[in-house]
């Protein structure tokens, strides 16, 4: 431990915590949780279409409006400048209030890369706004508050909080932004340690309000659910989601159904979840087709 403390950890790849989490579980527990490390390339395949591309497309529309106003600016502070600046501030407010939820966040790799994506988009918009003649803002509005998580395993939930903070600080350091010092690290209570499907007192668990959902939910086949999760839990789960998720469906389908229901209700813009090929057949197919 003393030797490790003497090393420079400032450039650590935070995705390593996913490996630490997976290896920290005994094989039986890992099987029960369906817990497996998701590599950054796979995560980006979801982050791109769910978060990055839609936000960049929206920013391009805002930038075009700013550019049209910028062409009319005769001096800094005139009505055209103020209108252009107001558009940019409104855009920043949208980024500040944006929320990405991983309702099975494990050690936080999806949260880290979602946060990085948001910060990259904001940084890009700051640079373009400056090119169009607007003054640079003092600081960024995106940060750890933008990513929400739910994780049943207490160890993994704490790793997720550490992962997000390290990712935030590394990004700021790499892009020339100072660290906040008061406090140095806020608590990340919005990365919750609880069940994402069933509420503690019974019934369906609520998910926090978010713009998008991304993640790699646990997968566990129908025949293994009772053996791994217990009769009582499996019975309650299937009863709670009766009529929405067939009794023979894989555990991962419950996350798909909840995301689908929120999109249908207008409470969620998009969702991107990892699943195995088995989701395309049998009882699972009914959830996908819903």
What are these regions (language model features)?
Residues 29-289:
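SAM-dependent methyltransferase catalytic region
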Residues 1-26:
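Long recognition/docking surfaces used for binding and targeting
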């Amino acid at each position: 431990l003393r030797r490790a403390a003497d090393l420079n950890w400032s450039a650590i790849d935070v995705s390593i915590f996913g490996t630490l989490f997976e290896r920290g579980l005994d094989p039986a527990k890992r099987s029960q949780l369906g817990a497996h490390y998701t590599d950054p390339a796979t995560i980006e395949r979801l982050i791109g279409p769910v978060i990055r591309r839609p936000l960049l497309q929206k920013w391009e529309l805002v930038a075009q409006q700013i550019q049209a106003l910028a062409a009319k600016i005769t001096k800094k502070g005139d009505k055209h400048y103020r209108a252009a600046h107001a558009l940019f501030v409104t855009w920043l407010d949208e980024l500040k209030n944006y929320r990405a939820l991983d309702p099975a966040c494990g050690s936080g790799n999806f949260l880290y890369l979602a946060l990085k994506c948001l910060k990259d988009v904001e940084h890009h918009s700051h640079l373009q706004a400056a090119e169009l003649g607007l003054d640079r803002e003092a600081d960024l509005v995106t940060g750890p508050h933008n990513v929400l998580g739910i994780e049943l395993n207490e160890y993994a939930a704490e790793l997720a909080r550490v992962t997000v903070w390290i990712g935030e600080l590394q990004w700021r350091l790499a892009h020339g932004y100072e660290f906040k010092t008061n406090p140095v690290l806020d608590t990340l209570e919005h990365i919750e340690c609880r069940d994402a499907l069933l509420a503690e007192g019974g019934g369906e668990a609520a998910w926090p309000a978010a713009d998008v959902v991304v993640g790699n939910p646990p997968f566990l086949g129908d025949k293994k659910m009772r053996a791994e999760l217990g009769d009582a839990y499996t019975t309650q789960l299937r009863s709670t989601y009766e009529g929405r998720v067939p009794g023979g469906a894989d555990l991962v389908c419950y996350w798909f159904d909840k995301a689908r229901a929120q999109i249908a209700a207008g409470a969620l813009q998009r969702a991107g979840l990892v699943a195995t090929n088995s989701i395309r057949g049998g009882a699972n197919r009914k959830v996908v087709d819903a």
